[in-house]
């Protein structure tokens, strides 16, 4: 009952004018903080993991943890495959019980991207699994990229409609100027492009690379159709910096049950802020 597909979550967000945050988890403490905070705020959240996270923790272990915590807190949770690229890997995890998938073939030419994504969609929809795919590519900040090159990396609004119709995806991740990781300076998001995509595509839209974005920018993207906000680096950085500071100030510390508390507190602040920025408190 409590481990759910993201499809209904994102459709509700689209109707309600808010976004659902997807937090990439890397250890037990991250998952505890995300679930506890979401439950306290009655906010819908998505537990996301890259292939590396699933390899590190084990698919069955992650599924068991999410299921147990959803029941413990009486709070619906979705567990989501983030940036997965291999069909066989996705199929295995779906058969294990995962109900939300992002197939990332955005590095491929347009026609091949469609073909790869449609293969995954056709398989996943047999299991009532929701599928997200990306059109366009996120990068880092590269000063030597020319305007026409940047445009080629961003999501083309007209192509977005063709892509959505040809693949049958449930949500679309768009490239409008965000990047994975934290920003050295404030990014310039292409809001007009996002608005055009919204006019061409009626699916819930997804924003990757949201770590470090301002509240104003996040809320503006939501007004223009973003229904899912991905956060990873911001959580990792909060965990790491707090842990470093604690161990520097308490070099005698040896018990992780003690020294991880400050790291959890720092992550809790991040999760609370993202939920507030997404406007999803009280929506679960």
UniProtKB/Swiss-Prot annotation:
Function: Catalytic subunit of the tagatose-1,6-bisphosphate aldolase GatYZ, which catalyzes the reversible aldol condensation of dihydroxyacetone phosphate (DHAP or glycerone-phosphate) with glyceraldehyde 3-phosphate (G3P) to produce tagatose 1,6-bisphosphate (TBP). Requires GatZ subunit for full activity and stability. Is involved in the catabolism of galactitol.
Similarity comment: family membership: Belongs to the class II fructose-bisphosphate aldolase family. TagBP aldolase GatY subfamily.
One GO MF term attached to the UniProt entry: zinc ion binding
Cofactor dependency: Zn(2+)
Official protein name in the record: D-tagatose-1,6-bisphosphate aldolase subunit GatY
Active site: 82
GO biological process, one term: D-tagatose 6-phosphate catabolic process
Enzyme class: lyase
Pathway: Carbohydrate metabolism; D-tagatose 6-phosphate degradation; D-glyceraldehyde 3-phosphate and glycerone phosphate from D-tagatose 6-phosphate: step 2/2
Metal-binding in keyword set: yes
Protein source organism: Shigella flexneri
EC identifiers of the protein: 4.1.2.40
CDD domains: TBP_aldolase_IIB
InterPro entries documented for this protein: Aldolase_TIM, Class_II_FBP_aldolase, FBA_II, TagBP_ald_KbaY/GatY, TagBP_aldolase_GatY
One Gene Ontology term, aspect cellular component: cytosol
Binding locations of Zn(2+): 83, 180, 208
Keywords per UniProt: Galactitol metabolism, Lyase, Metal-binding, Zinc
Catalytic activity: D-tagatofuranose 1,6-bisphosphate = D-glyceraldehyde 3-phosphate + dihydroxyacetone phosphate
